């Protein structure tokens, strides 16, 4: 009887320990997901900021090309 209680107690304790271990892993994974979400948000913000910089560079290049075209046209006259 005592041996059965001891074995049963060991099984319960073992399964409880495994449950705590799983919860710790789940908590760690949840923390990792939150960290990755924060990084994705930061990268998304960086990409959006770069889009406006790229558009400004394209606009500057277009204006420079237009000036060069105007100068080339003036030399041909």
Swiss-Prot record:
One of its GO terms (biological process) is periplasmic space organization. This is Major outer membrane lipoprotein Lpp. The keyword Aminoacyl-tRNA synthetase does not apply. Sequence repeats lie at residues 23-33, 37-47. It holds the Pfam family LPP. Residues 1-19 form the signal peptide. Homotrimer. A lipid is attached at residue 20 (N-palmitoyl cysteine). One of its GO terms (cellular component) is extracellular region. Keywords: Cell outer membrane, Cell wall, Coiled coil, Lipoprotein, Membrane, Palmitate, Peptidoglycan-anchor, Repeat, Secreted, Signal. Belongs to the Lpp family. It is a lipid-anchor; Peptidoglycan-anchor. InterPro entries: Lipoprotein_leucine-zipper_dom (IPR006817), MOM_Lpp (IPR016367). Gene3D superfamilies: 1.20.5.190. One of its GO terms (molecular function) is lipid binding. A highly abundant outer membrane lipoprotein that controls the distance between the inner and outer membranes. The only protein known to be covalently linked to the peptidoglycan network (PGN). Also non-covalently binds the PGN. The link between the cell outer membrane and PGN contributes to maintenance of the structural and functional integrity of the cell envelope, and maintains the correct distance between the PGN and the outer membrane. It is found in: Cell outer membrane; Secreted, Cell wall. The modification N6-murein peptidoglycan lysine is found at residue 77. A lipid is attached at residue 20 (S-diacylglycerol cysteine). Residues 26-74 form a coiled coil. The keyword Repeat applies. It comes from Serratia marcescens. Residues 56-77 are annotated as: Disordered.
């Amino acid at each position: 009887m005592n041996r059965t209680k001891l074995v049963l107690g060991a099984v319960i304790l073992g399964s409880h320990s495994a449950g705590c271990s799983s919860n710790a892993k789940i908590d760690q994974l949840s923390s990792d997901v939150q960290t990755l979400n924060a990084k994705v948000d930061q990268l998304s913000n960086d990409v959006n900021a770069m889009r406006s910089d790229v558009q400004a560079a394209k606009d500057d290049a277009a204006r420079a090309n237009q000036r060069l075209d105007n100068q080339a046209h003036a030399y041909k006259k």
